[in-house]
From Swiss-Prot:
Its main location: cytoplasm. It comes from Metamycoplasma arthritidis (strain 158L3-1) (Mycoplasma arthritidis). Forms a heterotetramer with UvrA during the search for lesions. Interacts with UvrC in an incision complex. Belongs to the UvrB family. One of its GO terms (cellular component) is cytoplasm. Keywords: ATP-binding, Cytoplasm, DNA damage, DNA excision, DNA repair, Excision nuclease, Helicase, Hydrolase, Nucleotide-binding, SOS response. Residues 622-657 form the UVR domain. Residues 26-196 form the Helicase ATP-binding domain. This is UvrABC system protein B. ATP binds at G39, V40, T41, G42, S43, G44, K45, T46. The beta-hairpin motif is involved in DNA binding. The UvrABC repair system catalyzes the recognition and processing of DNA lesions. A damage recognition complex composed of 2 UvrA and 2 UvrB subunits scans DNA for abnormalities. Upon binding of the UvrA(2)B(2) complex to a putative damaged site, the DNA wraps around one UvrB monomer. DNA wrap is dependent on ATP binding by UvrB and probably causes local melting of the DNA helix, facilitating insertion of UvrB beta-hairpin between the DNA strands. Then UvrB probes one DNA strand for the presence of a lesion. SUPFAM superfamilies: C-terminal UvrC-binding domain of UvrB, P-loop containing nucleoside triphosphate hydrolases.
Length: 660
């Protein structure tokens, strides 16, 4: 049966969307390698892309510049394509501090990290889906350019099974162990299996709502059943299926032995190099550290920092680029680069920073030179992938515009009929008093405000000044963690704050329809956040409200301001003429306030336990409550009392009565 994308939406494309969809689809059909979609804020670019994917019916990868935006895109596309595979691929670390050495202070910093098992499982689901299904969309962060296992090796570990298959139980269990599954007789977690009589129950290492039970009759598979992990109720059956590996880093014994031999050879050469340069400390250091790693590899098949030997494990030549998510994409895939004006510079910068850190480790004997091949893609390596690419932004960068020779697909009309905000220019003299007067008007109308300063100090001082004036104010800067920033912006939407002050509020990626006024202090100053693209992005923040307004505080009109204002007037003219022609009355976007986003998954602070859920319904979900109680009990038994208390407090908060 052909796997087709089926888009579910009560709305049809409107405004500029039909023309944009047609232009992009035609461009792909015409073999255009690069296209740019210039869509204003709130014009429904995600819906346009969803329609393009549905019409092309080709596997698609959407890359976003941060986990927050990636999570939003994932949620939106999952709702639009409930019958297809929509997957999520971001870093699986909740916390990560890389290994480093600082020569000036002779300080070695060991790698410390905390893995998120749910995100790890979601990554595996993404590469599994790309391997077997054409109707797959993957939403990824910059993690897409970091190393993954060799796709050839990974797919060799796929284990197809079917009813009637001749295989004895011992061979079946051995095969499960070879693809990374561990036996657990007590309680199954991801990547584990248990055997009871003639039945083998498997908890997949990837995202799955069910466990898999294989029933044997002698040396034959008699039945393959999908069962609920808790109740053990049968959810379905299969005549055949593919068991995917429990982890992406499943390594066979012969590969490990070959890897160890090659590492020993490089180690010998490196020791000789250090000795010939009279660096005896470095020679001894690299010898001790590497041999310790090799002992672990031989005994356990794993060592801390195993990624530094990925070149050997993957079978790559020195200097060969790493395997990444792109190597799992089918040949007819399409790549969408969201917020390309931010994503492209991010892709440019990742390799150099990584290499600079590792060079010190290699130079001072903490790592072998082959560790330099454990790296993200260089930008030119990313650019060499010949998949058609669509760059999406309200302010495309020079790179993507050069690739298309300035040709763009535009989307200026919003389905809501909203116009770009009015821009006013006020004097910088007495700008604080002027802002205070406007804030009083805003509060009277129960509308929200953003204020953009040029320094952290100014943001903090202005916020404190407003608080002294009894205005509910908060400030944001880059020392705040992502979920802290999102909590403040959620508070702004809910009315906990009347105004939020910050320097760069563009990277949040969160819609704020309640914001009808944006005040830009020192708009005529020079710098990154007052260039033309940044000013256009700032103006767009007030474009979700039917009487949005932006005030530039300036004593002169800079070229960036002039270009922004001209762009604003041009768009407003197109939008107002369209509204007049079609009798459309602009209307503020009404958007529900979603739970805060932490670690890239829509959830409350307890996301590490219960993943992405409609929290308002959780109290009535018996299966979910049972899972939480069970998890709480497990954590308590493992003496992880703080985490157990978190779950207990959450359950009490949503009204669940717990037995003592």
């Amino acid at each position: 049966m052909e796997e087709k994308f089926v888009l579910h939406s009560p709305f049809a494309p409107s405004g500029d969307q039909p023309e944009a969809i047609k232009a992009l689809v035609d461009g792909i059909d015409e073999k255009k390698e690069h296209q740019v979609l210039l869509g204003v804020t709130g014009s429904g670019k995600t819906f346009t892309i969803a329609n393009v994917i549905a019409q092309l019916n080709r596997p698609s990868l959407i890359i976003s510049h941060n986990k927050t935006l990636a999570s939003q895109l994932y949620s939106e596309l999952k709702a639009l394509f409930p019958d297809n595979r929509v997957e999520y691929f971001v870093s699986y670390f909740d916390f990560y501090k890389p290994e480093a050495y600082i020569p000036k202070s002779d300080l070695y910093i060991e790698k410390t990290s905390k893995n998120n098992k749910e995100l790890e499982a979601m990554r595996m689901s993404a590469i599994n889906a790309l391997s077997i299904r054409k109707d797959t969309i993957v939403v990824a962060s910059v993690a897409a350019i970091y190393g993954e296992s060799n796709p050839k090796h990974y797919r060799q570990n796929f284990f197809p099974i079917e009813v009637g298959m001749q295989i004895d139980r011992k061979s079946l269990l051995l095969k499960l162990s070879q693809i990374g599954y561990e036996r657990n007789r007590m309680e199954l977690n991801k990547g584990q299996f248990d055997v009871k009589g003639d039945s083998i129950e498997i908890c997949p290492g990837y995202v799955s709502d069910t466990n898999i039970r294989i029933d044997m009759f002698g040396n034959e598979i008699e039945a393959i059943t999908l069962i609920d992990p808790l109740s053990k109720n049968v959810e379905g059956s299969r005549k055949n299926m593919t068991l995917f590996p429990a982890t992406t880093y499943t390594v066979h014994e012969n590969t490990i032995q070959n890897t160890v031999d090659l590492i020993k050879q490089e180690l010998s050469e490196r020791i000789e190099y250090f000795k010939s340069h009279d660096k005896l400390l470095e020679a001894q250091r690299i010898k001790d550290r590497t041999l310790n790693d090799l002992d672990s590899l031989l005994e356990f098949g794993y060592t801390s920092g195993i990624e530094n030997y990925s070149r050997y494990l993957d079978g790559r030549a020195p200097g060969q680029r790493p395997y990444t998510l792109f190597d799992y994409l089918p040949d007819d895939s399409v790549i969408f680069i969201d917020e390309s004006h931010l994503m492209i510079p991010q892709l440019h910068g990742m390799h150099n920073g990584d290499r600079a850190r590792k060079l010190s480790l290699v130079e001072y004997g903490f790592r072998l030179p082959s560790a330099l091949d454990n790296r993200p893609l260089r930008f030119e390596e990313f650019a060499e992938f010949k998949f058609p690419k669509i760059y999406i932004s309200a302010t495309p960068g020079d790179y993507e515009l050069d690739l298309t020779h300035g040709e763009i697909v535009t989307q200026y009309i919003r389905p809501t009929g909203l116009l770009d905000p009015i821009i006013e220019i006020h004097s910088r003299d007495n700008q604080i008093e002027d802002i205070y007067d406007h804030l009083k008007e805003q509060i009277a109308k129960k509308e929200r405000t953003l204020i953009l300063t040029t320094t952290k100090k100014n943001a903090e001082e202005l916020s404190l000044f407003l608080q002294e004036k009894k205005i509910k104010s908060a400030y944001i800067h880059d020392r705040f963690k992502i979920f802290e920033r999102n909590e403040i912006l959620k508070g702004l939407r809910m009315g906990k704050f009347d105004v939020v002050v910050g320097i760069n509020l563009l990277k949040e990626g969160i819609d704020l329809p309640e914001v009808s006024l944006i005040c830009v202090l020192n708009a005529d100053s020079t710098g990154l956040m007052r260039d033309t693209r940044s000013l256009i992005q700032i103006v767009g923040r007030a474009a979700r409200n039917d009487h949005g307004k932006v005030i530039f505080y300036a004593n002169e009109i800079t070229s960036s301001m002039r270009e922004c204002i001209e762009d604003n007037l041009f768009k407003r003219k197109i939008q107002s003429e369209y509204n007049e022609k079609h009798n459309i009355i602009p209307k503020t976007i009404v958007k529900p306030i979603a739970p805060p986003i932490q670690n890239g998954i829509l959830s409350e602070d307890h996301s590490k336990y219960y993943g992405e859920k409609d929290l308002s319904q959780m109290k009535h979900n018996k299966k979910f409550i049972d899972q939480m109680v069970r998890k709480m009990t497990q954590l308590a038994k493992a003496n992880k009392f703080e985490e157990a208390i978190e779950i207990r407090d959450y359950l009490i908060e949503i009204g669940i009565e717990l037995d003592k």
